[in-house]
Regions:
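C-terminal tail/sorting-segment detector
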Residues: 2-8, 89-112
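Glycine-centered coil/turn sites that cap beta-strands in beta-rich domains
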Residues: 6-29, 33-53, 63, 75-78
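A generic beta-sheet turn/junction motif
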Residues: 32-34, 57, 99-101
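Solvent-exposed residues in well-ordered beta-strands and their adjoining turns
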Residues: 42-44, 81, 98, 111
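Short, acidic, Ser/Thr-enriched surface-loop or helix-capping motifs
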Residues: 55-56, 82
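Surface-exposed loop/edge segments in extracytoplasmic proteins
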Residues: 59-65
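Short, surface-exposed loop/turn motifs with a glycine/proline- and acidic-biased composition
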Residues: 65-100
Length: 112
């Protein structure tokens, strides 16, 4: 997980980026993907949050992040591997963002 932007300052002196007003889980890019999708998400306040990947049958494949997050703009990449490090097959997968105040699931497609 990487924090994309300092929520208070831009790289340009004197320019400020406001904190997000609400939770947002964006569609991964690229989609379809091969080999690595990037998942962007926004968090309006400091909170514990997780992002997990599920197969089309609902089986949890891997947890990408499960930790305390600062408010701001974040992203995480998935290497298309399961929790044991095995490469997963092509197909439909779902990623789910979950915090105390927000749950959102989106679909992505892995091409092999």
């Amino acid at each position: 997980m990487e924090r994309v932007l300092d929520p208070q300052k831009n790289k340009e002196p004197g320019k400020y980026i406001p904190l997000p007003e609400k939770f947002i889980l964006k569609q991964n890019r690229p989609n379809p993907f091969n080999p690595t999708p990037r998942i962007h998400y926004r968090i309006p306040k400091d909170t514990q949050a997780s992002i997990a990947i599920f197969d089309e049958k609902g089986k949890k494949i891997v947890v990408l992040v499960d930790q305390e997050h600062e408010a701001g703009y974040h992203h995480v990449d998935w290497n298309a591997r399961d929790r044991s490090g095995n490469v997963v097959s092509g197909g439909v997968y779902f990623y789910q963002f979950q915090s105390k105040d927000y749950v959102k699931t989106r679909k992505m497609i892995l091409l092999r």
